[in-house]
Amino acid sequence: VALNAAQPGFATTVAALRLRSWKLGAGQPMDVIDKFTDADFSHIVDDRADVHVSSRDGRFYLGYFPNGRPGGADEDWVTGEGWVIAVTGTADVPGYRMAFGTDTPAEIVAAVVARILATSQPL
């Protein structure tokens, strides 16, 4: 960033900011859901049209909540949480959980899912 210490305040140029365009908008949830084969995963669509995907061994879970995830301390909607991914750990290594907002681009979530699936191996 171009900075002139002799002048009070902050000054820069558009070129110095290196403005970028970023992927925004929820996108198409099927970009994520299509990553899961019927042979290896169970798919459930509930009465709220939320989608739940789990691995046959039960160690992987993905939830898609287009209107936000239900639940919370007062059973209110957890507003803004649109995607939940969880992998159960083992006796020796803890698992992990991550969540993405309802406006997170599905393309970004799909990339995360693809990477997780690439790391799993049959026993």
PLM features: what roles do these ranges have?
Residues 1-5, 60-110:
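Intrinsically disordered, low-complexity regulatory segments enriched in Ser/Thr/Pro
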Residues 2-59, 123:
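Negatively charged, low-complexity tracts enriched in Asp/Glu with abundant Ser/Thr
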Residues 114-122:
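Cytoplasmic membrane-interface segments at the C-terminal ends of transmembrane helices
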